[in-house]
Amino acid sequence: MFSAAIGYEILPTLRASVEYHFFDDKHAGMANVTLPDGTSVAKQKTLKHGTHEYLAGMEWDITKRLTVSGGFQKTNYGLSNDFQTDTSFSCDSYSLGFGARVNLTQAWSIDVAYFWTHYNKYTKETDSYNGTGLKGTDIYNRTNKVFGLSLNYKF
């Protein structure tokens, strides 16, 4: 894995950061998959490249008691038809997240957040769908929406 990040305090109450992550998935140890021609190969070898992640975020202290934040993440896995299966698939995506912290006291705070991910549909067309000799198509897709709430105590 390779990671690079930079953060900058624009104002004492406003901060921004950008990050890049690379996961060398093409050289990871994954289980074997059977290709359409019947050969077996380590699944990671079917990727076009490793995973690239691009991130950016901002945080703003509106008051001493209230902080809001927002962020973005774009993920590209380097997918191929041979990598995708009915039991294990991935989809390139982008995510947006928003949050807030309310400082109740110096020790206690409450965080609330919402995170939404849009996954790109991946269409896999084959000439012999599941070995039937007939053309077929699989469309891989998913969605992700997360709400978070926490009560924090600082020792």
Q: Where are these predicted regions, by residue range?
A:
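Residues that define the transmembrane beta-barrel architecture of outer-membrane proteins
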Residues: F2, K45, G50-Y54, D92-Y94, ...
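Oxyanion-binding "anion nests"
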Residues: F2-M30
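Repeated loop/turn-to-beta-strand initiation elements of outer-membrane beta-barrel proteins
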Residues: T13-A16, R65-V68, V102, Q106-I110
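Transmembrane beta-barrel strands of outer-membrane/channel proteins
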Residues: V18-F22, G70-K74, V112-W116
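Outer-membrane beta-barrel translocator domains and adjoining extracellular loop/strand segments
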Residues: A28-D37, G78-T87, Y122-N130
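Extracellular loop and loop/strand-boundary signature of outer-membrane beta-barrel proteins
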Residues: T39-K45, N81-S88, G133-I139
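Outer-membrane beta-barrel "beta-signal"
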Residues: A100-V102, W108, Y114, N141-F155
